Amino acid sequence: MIVWMGVYDQRSKGKITKSISDLPGIHSSYMDLKEGTLVVMGDVDPVELVRNLRKKWGKAKLTLYVPYDALKEAKIAEAKQKREEIEREALYRYNREIRDIFNDKEEQGCVIC
C-alpha cells in the first residue's frame, strides 16, 4: 500500500519509520522522499496504519492499496533468485579452445623394408 505523507527530509523520515515499526504485520517499508510517499508491504490493516500515522504525524492519505499475498511475494523472490543464479553461472562459463596436438617424432608414414 502507498500512503502519501508529504515528507521530504531525512529527519521526518526517521520519525515516521520509527512510529510504524511497532505495528504488527509490516514486512517492509520504504519512504520515497522525492514524492513524499510511504510504501508499506505486509499484512497490516490500512485503516489502523493511517490512523496511527495521522495521530503521530498529522497528515496521511491512503493513495493505493493492494492486498499483500505472502505466497505470491515468495514465488516472485524465488524466481528472481533463480534468474540471478542462472546469470551468475553464465558468467563463469567459457568456450574452451580445442587444440590439435601433432607429434612429428612418431610419424606413421610409408616404410619400405
Swiss-Prot record:
PROSITE patterns: HMA_2 (PS50846). A lipid is attached at residue 110 (S-farnesyl cysteine). Pfam families: HMA (PF00403). Residues 1-65 form the HMA domain. SUPFAM superfamilies: HMA, heavy metal-associated domain (SSF55008). The keyword Lipoprotein applies. The modification Cysteine methyl ester is found at residue 110. The keyword Transcription regulation does not apply. Expressed in embryo sacs. One of its GO terms (molecular function) is metal ion binding. Keywords: Coiled coil, Lipoprotein, Metal-binding, Methylation, Prenylation. Residues 69-89 form a coiled coil. Residues 111-113 form a propeptide. PANTHER family: COPPER TRANSPORT PROTEIN FAMILY-RELATED, HEAVY METAL-ASSOCIATED ISOPRENYLATED PLANT PROTEIN 12-RELATED. Probable heavy-metal-binding protein. Belongs to the HIPP family. This is Heavy metal-associated isoprenylated plant protein 15. The lineage of its organism: Eukaryota, Viridiplantae, Streptophyta, Embryophyta, Tracheophyta.
